């Protein structure tokens, strides 16, 4: 599935129709113009073979996040959330190295730990995955709480709290409040697996 996401320097909608041509099973787009181009192409097409499905929505990013949340809610996988100012990726890799020797384990690829990376990580989890390690980063207040609302971690690990990205947070207190949201999420999950770890 190709999600046509927008960024500061790109617009995935520009590649949506190309993705279908190259075999994508589906495209999710929030561009009226691209949807109209798709419909026009479908009308003109004389091929009997159908291409992938085009989903037109109000916001492609929100659709990605909602789909990830839906997928997470269907999983029985134990989700371990990791946050902190530094050391998230190293901690994730160390934990993955240990757990994957005994369990079918999935982990965030690289440091894809934001509002796009966390949903992509969740969507990569298969039904037979026993443990998933989800890295969660933040550069502004409220971001960890939002990521937790999607990932619903059973366990939380906080590596440390420093002053990196303080320009987005404005104060150390805001950083602490934001990072603490991981623990609040785990505590409020009422999961029988709930555990919290602080470095």
Feature roles, as predicted:
Residues 1-81, 90-101, 123:
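Short, basic phosphate-binding NTP loop
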Residues 56, 62-198:
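Phosphate-binding loop of NTP-binding sites
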């Amino acid at each position: 599935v190709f999600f046509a996401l927008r960024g500061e320097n790109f617009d995935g909608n520009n590649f949506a129709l190309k993705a279908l041509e190259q075999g994508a099973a589906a495209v999710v787009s929030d561009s009226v113009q691209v949807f109209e181009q798709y419909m026009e192409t479908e009308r003109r097409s004389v091929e009997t073979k159908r291409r992938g499905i085009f989903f037109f929505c109000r916001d492609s990013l929100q659709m990605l996040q909602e789909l990830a949340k839906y997928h997470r809610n269907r999983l029985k996988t134990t989700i371990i959330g990791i946050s902190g100012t530094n050391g998230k990726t190293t901690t994730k890799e160390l934990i993955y190295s240990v757990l994957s020797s005994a369990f079918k384990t999935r982990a965030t690829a690289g440091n894809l730990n934001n509002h796009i990376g966390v949903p992509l990580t969740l969507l990569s989890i298969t039904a037979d995955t026993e443990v998933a390690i989800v890295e969660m980063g933040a550069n502004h207040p409220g971001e960890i709480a939002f990521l937790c609302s999607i990932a619903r971690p059973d366990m939380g690990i906080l590596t440390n709290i420093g002053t990196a990205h303080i320009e987005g947070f404005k104060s150390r207190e805001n950083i602490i409040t934001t990072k603490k949201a991981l623990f609040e999420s785990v505590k409020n999950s009422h999961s029988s697996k709930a555990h919290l770890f602080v470095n």
